[in-house]
UniProtKB/Swiss-Prot annotation:
The gene is murD. GO terms for cellular component: cytoplasm. Pathway: Cell wall biogenesis; peptidoglycan biosynthesis. Belongs to the MurCDEF family. It is found in: Cytoplasm. GO terms for biological process: cell division; cell wall organization; peptidoglycan biosynthetic process; regulation of cell shape. Gene3D superfamilies: Mur ligase, C-terminal domain, Mur-like, catalytic domain, NAD(P)-binding Rossmann-like Domain. InterPro entries: Mur-like_cat_sf, Mur_ligase_C, Mur_ligase_C_dom_sf, Mur_ligase_cen, MurD. Keywords: ATP-binding, Cell cycle, Cell division, Cell shape, Cell wall biogenesis/degradation, Cytoplasm, Ligase, Nucleotide-binding, Peptidoglycan synthesis. It comes from Lachnospira eligens (strain ATCC 27750 / DSM 3376 / VPI C15-48 / C15-B4). This is UDP-N-acetylmuramoylalanine--D-glutamate ligase. It catalyses: UDP-N-acetyl-alpha-D-muramoyl-L-alanine + D-glutamate + ATP = UDP-N-acetyl-alpha-D-muramoyl-L-alanyl-D-glutamate + ADP + phosphate + H(+). Pfam families: Mur_ligase_C, Mur_ligase_M, MurD-like_N. GO terms for molecular function: ATP binding; UDP-N-acetylmuramoylalanine-D-glutamate ligase activity.
Length: 450
């Protein structure tokens, strides 16, 4: 859609909304920036806009404006069943998210990654591999820069490697990657998607516009994805940490291999990698399958996998203080992600958990404590819920904190040389922190100042 001289309303005044306005200004659209939060300071919103131009509307929305608006662009935090979105849909006005908006201007090849866990690490690794092959590579999403901020730099010979959330996939229409991947589907964001079936369907939309000329990489150990595979419109390639697939990357003992269906190829030994944990073997297998599908030579793939180091906030080594290793896994925002971090620990571990309640259950989280966790330090809204689950399974060594400062103090006082301290909350950061990045960086600053 050519948006020049069209009137576009953007909902949300956060990073995503401001980024959308910036792109729309550059392509010649007329913008309205709307946020229903009446408490917002108009002047601060104007300052966020900088040199960008948009009519700012805060609070109530006048439906008389509908007749002049050609397109609604919503931020990921705006549910598609919210009143403002339904008003536009009922009026027959298209509703896009930031992914669809950016895709409208992407001239290059797109590689897109989603999944409940592992997105950031896999996106970073795929981005590093592709960039070693072609310097015109843009890594976008929760990692790196925003898609809307980078898209006008793309060209016919460029690559975009995009990390995409379920919230963003709710609003795709024509988005078409040449290679997509769904890493896994486990319970998350059920306060938004309501059911696992709806959540899984939303994730699967990443391949909705693909054809058999494209590739969709799926996890052979995920039942949602093995059930989805026959319906997938793309050519399916698998990855697995447990067994050899028909076609794809897999772990065989200490070797990561690739099979094309006829021949098997050794890629690298797991001990040649800098990443901790079995879940990272899965991430590497997914990245290998994706980059081979994109036509990247094996020698470049192997070299970059060996060079790759953990991303910030994902089982990130922070420091050793008084013989105690501290790890930041603030990106572990659901129980399944946190379990993988716990499993990666090889020393007696003091675990920091809790945060905003997304409707998760914590049984798997607590079950993972056995023979791993010596003390649990709880913080945030879910403290009582997690503690109740601990009682259910007989885990009683729990302390509580009201701030990250208290958390780190408790950990430092209880840890002995040879222990590990792991921040892997199994919950979102909202309420106490702006985002998981802020939570992780505050933790790291406090640890480094011990």
């Amino acid at each position: 859609m050519d948006l020049k001289n069209k009137t576009v309303m953007v909902v949300g005044t956060g990073i995503s909304g401001i980024g959308a306005v910036d792109l729309l200004n550059k392509v010649g659209a007329d913008c309205i920036l709307y946020d229903g939060n009446e408490k917002l300071d108009r002047q601060k919103v104007q300052e966020k806009l900088g040199d960008n131009k948009a009519e700012i509307i805060i609070g109530a929305f006048d439906e008389a404006l509908l007749s002049k608006i050609d397109l609604l662009v919503i931020s990921p935090g705006v549910p598609i069943d919210s009143p403002i979105v339904l008003t536009f849909k009922n009026a027959g006005i298209p509703v896009w998210g930031e992914i669809e908006l950016a895709y409208n201007y992407d001239k290059g090849k797109i590689i897109a990654i989603t999944g409940t866990n592992g997105k950031t690490t896999t996106t970073a690794l795929v981005g590093q591999i592709i960039a070693a092959y072609n310097e015109k590579t843009f890594v976008v999403g929760n990692i790196g820069n925003s898609y809307t901020g980078e898209v006008l730099k793309t060209s016919e010979d460029s690559y975009t490697v995009a990390e995409i959330s379920s919230f963003q996939l709710e609003t795709v229409h024509e988005f078409h990657p040449i290679v997509s991947a769904i890493l896994n589907i486990t319970p998350d964001h059920l306060n938004r998607h309501h059911t696992m079936e709806c959540y899984a369907w939303t994730k699967e939309r990443i391949s909705e516009n693909q054809t058999k000329a494209d590739t969709c990489v799926l996890n052979l150990e995920d039942k949602y994805l093995t059930d989805f595979a026959p319906e997938c419109k793309a050519n399916v390639v698998w990855f697995s940490s447990e067994r050899k697939p028909s076609v794809g990357a897999y772990v065989d003992g200490e070797m990561i291999k690739y099979t094309d269906g006829t021949n098997d190829y050794d890629m690298l030994n797991v001990h040649d990698m800098n990443l901790l944990g079995k879940h990272n073997y899965e991430n590497v297998c997914a990245a290998i399958a994706m980059t081979k599908a994109a036509g990247i030579p094996d020698d470049i793939i192997i070299e970059q996998v060996k060079k790759f180091k953990a991303v910030e906030h994902r089982i990130e080594y922070v420091a050793t203080k008084n013989g105690v290793d501290y790890y930041n896994d603030s990106k572990g925002t659901n129980p399944e992600a946190a379990v993988k971090a716990i499993e990666a620990m090889v020393k007696p571990t003091i675990l920091i958990g809790g945060g905003y309640d997304k409707g998760s259950e914590f049984d798997l989280y607590v079950k993972a404590f056995k023979d791993k966790v010596k003390l649990l330090v709880l913080i945030g809204q879910t403290s009582a819920k997690i503690a109740d689950t601990c009682k259910k399974y007989g885990f009683e060594n729990i302390e509580y904190a009201d701030s990250m400062e208290q958390v780190v103090d408790i950990c430092a006082k209880n840890a002995v040389s040879g222990d590990a301290v792991l921040l892997s909350p199994a919950c979102a950061s909202w309420g106490m922190f702006d985002n998981y990045e802020q939570r992780g960086r505050i933790f790291k600053d406090l640890v480094n100042n011990l």
